[in-house]
C-alpha cells in the first residue's frame, strides 16, 4: 500500500530511526489503524552494541516502531497533516519474545482515542504470528 518513500512523505523519521519499511493496510476514516512491517536486518546500527554476540532488537525500539506505525495513521488524517508527533507516555508495555536479525517485525497500531491534540494508540508487534511486544502509546501533536 505505502512503500518507504511514501512513508517518508508522511512521517518525519529518517535513518537510522525510521523503523517501518512498508504499510500493508490502513484505515483512517472509521476504525483508525495502520498495519505494516519492519524487515530487521543484521546491518541495523543498534545490533553493534545490543548485543554483538547475540543481537536482539532493543524493546524500546520495538515500541518506537509501533509509535511510528500509529504516526502514519495520525498524520494521514487531514486535520493533523504537517504536525509534529511527540511521545506523551507509554502504558501497559509487555515484551513477550525476542526480535533478532532476519525477522520480519509485523506492526499494528490502532488509534483508540483522540481528544484535541492528544491521543492514545494500541500497538502490537509480532514475529511469525506471535506477539513480541504490545503497548498503549500516548501521543501529542504540535
Curated annotation (Swiss-Prot):
Catalytic machinery residues: 50
What is the reaction catalyzed? a (3R)-hydroxyacyl-[ACP] = a (2E)-enoyl-[ACP] + H2O
Cell inner membrane among keywords: no
Against SUPFAM superfamilies, the record matches this protein to: Thioesterase/thiol ester dehydrase-isomerase
Q: Single GO cellular component annotation?
A: cytoplasm
Keywords per UniProt: Cytoplasm, Lipid A biosynthesis, Lipid biosynthesis, Lipid metabolism, Lyase
Against InterPro entries, the record matches this protein to: FabA_FabZ, FabZ, HotDog_dom_sf
Q: Which GO terms describe its biological process?
A: fatty acid biosynthetic process; lipid A biosynthetic process
Read off the CDD domains from this record. Answer: FabZ
Q: What is the E.C. number?
A: 4.2.1.59
Q: What class of enzyme is it?
A: lyase
Q: Which residues form a coiled coil?
A: none
Looking at the keywords, is Amino-acid biosynthesis present?
no
Pfam families linked: FabA
- Please give one Gene Ontology molecular function term for this protein: (3R)-hydroxyacyl-[acyl-carrier-protein] dehydratase activity
What family is this protein classified in? Belongs to the thioester dehydratase family. FabZ subfamily.
Its biological purpose: Involved in unsaturated fatty acids biosynthesis. Catalyzes the dehydration of short chain beta-hydroxyacyl-ACPs and long chain saturated and unsaturated beta-hydroxyacyl-ACPs.
Name of the protein: 3-hydroxyacyl-[acyl-carrier-protein] dehydratase FabZ
Gene behind the chain: fabZ
